Amino acid sequence: MKLAYWMYAGPAHIGTLRIASSFKNVHAIMHAPLGDDYFNVMRSMLERERDFTPVTASVVDRNVLARGSQEKVVDNIVRKDQEETPDLIVLTPTCTSSILQEDLQNFVDRAQMDAKGDVMLADVNHYRVNELQAADRTLQQIVQYYLEKGRKKGELPTGKTEKPSVNIIGMTTLGFHNQHDCTELKRLMADLGIEVNEVIPEGASVQNLKNLPRAWFNLVPYREVGLMAARYLEQEFSMPYVDITPMGVVETARCIRKMGQLLNQQGANVDYEEFINQQTLYVSQAAWFSRSIDCQNLTGKKAVVFGDNTHAAAMTRILAREMGIHVVLAGTYCKYDADWFKEQVREYCDEILISEDHGEIADAIARIEPSAIFGTQMERHVGKRLDIPCGVIAAPIHIQNFPIGYKPFLGYEGTNQIADLVYNSFTLGMEDHLLEIFGGHDTKEVITKSVSADSDLNWNKEAQTELNKVPGFVRGKVKRNTEKFARERGFSEITLEVMYAAKEAVGA
């Protein structure tokens, strides 16, 4: 266990709670000490929803430690069942309360006797998995629970829907632009003549899960959440699934072709080539933009990409393949699925970094000095410190990345959003320069660009004046190169001579 200033993926119980609170009329009870119950506050603050977060903490306190938890946990489950009348109550421990090694399944069985709704224990190992793996497992567990229950009662509908249809699996609360992506995918399906059978878990009712097998296929847009449920449905109900993320023009087309192929295998007769051409050439602006003079200005610019597997891999391919941007480093914090990530981005970047340590990523960014960063909220902080622009492309994210306006990242509208994000993330060099020329006397002073600490070197007046004459968009680089040169040579003060010598040394 380590004390973390920043975590990319939270502890396992956060993943379970994200799934439970995404469903309609499902309540979660968290068996946890005070301090582990921050999920309510986090979700209420970030998700722009009117409803309260349906999560209750059954607090582990000294009385519980003295007498055992059963009485308190069972009472809390039964009380919530009476107050809220949920369809399902999910009980989850946290990594802290798991230390008590209690038989929580026994508590659930005991509570089920008095509760009118269903009660379930989230079957997750809190020491082995993180938030994303736990979310994936919990979703699969809930789907399996209701399909097996329906099968026992003989309530599962037989046969497929009359028209081609799809289940969209993996849309969750606190996901990166999930609501917008969901709307865009529904529009895309409508354009393709595919009905949306169910969307899970966001906004879904557990009572409707028995209808999942009626769809012709499943779509899993995010690799992190939904794959286990899709594999279970394939295994038990022979339902094929598509796990290609429709992000960027090329991958969206590949995803649509795969969906068409699955439909035709089941007796449909669809051809989506004309639709793909129409969208690529005329509807999506991204393909046109990538050939425009604006985008050509970005060709060869250096970028660093970091995020979850889905978004980091997709963004790396879009930058390298569709926009001609040089991705120096692509990275992910999903260490448990590193092989897939390496396979996806190997051809499109120089370096691959698999790490959960934000300091390691920050140091890599400082070393590479890219023109732009595409990452999470943490990389945005790093970019601010280094004065490198950053586009946020993956969770974890803060409030400004839960936009009220429509901003999907998937589908053809998503390609437009990504093109805007990329273009606006690169500093337009002349803008800084012109501000400094015409900005009067209050031009900004030189900023130290170092992740770890401020500069320990002293610049004399002449050198400082000379540095201020350097255009803003390269000044940081000149300052860093000069200081590096001075340290290597053992100078404590930077003079004009040192500046010119450093310039000679780097051949600039």
From Swiss-Prot:
Which reaction is the catalytic activity of this chain?
A: chlorophyllide a + oxidized 2[4Fe-4S]-[ferredoxin] + 2 ADP + 2 phosphate = protochlorophyllide a + reduced 2[4Fe-4S]-[ferredoxin] + 2 ATP + 2 H2O
The answer to whether the entry has keyword Disulfide bond is no
Q: Name one Pfam family in it.
A: PCP_red
**Active-site positions on this chain:** 294 (proton donor)
One GO term under biological process is: light-independent chlorophyll biosynthetic process
Q: Name one GO molecular function term.
A: oxidoreductase activity, acting on iron-sulfur proteins as donors
Annotated residues for binding of substrate: 429-430
> What is the recorded name of this protein?
Light-independent protochlorophyllide reductase subunit B
What taxonomic lineage is listed for the species of origin?
Answer: Bacteria, Bacillati, Cyanobacteriota, Cyanophyceae, Oscillatoriophycideae
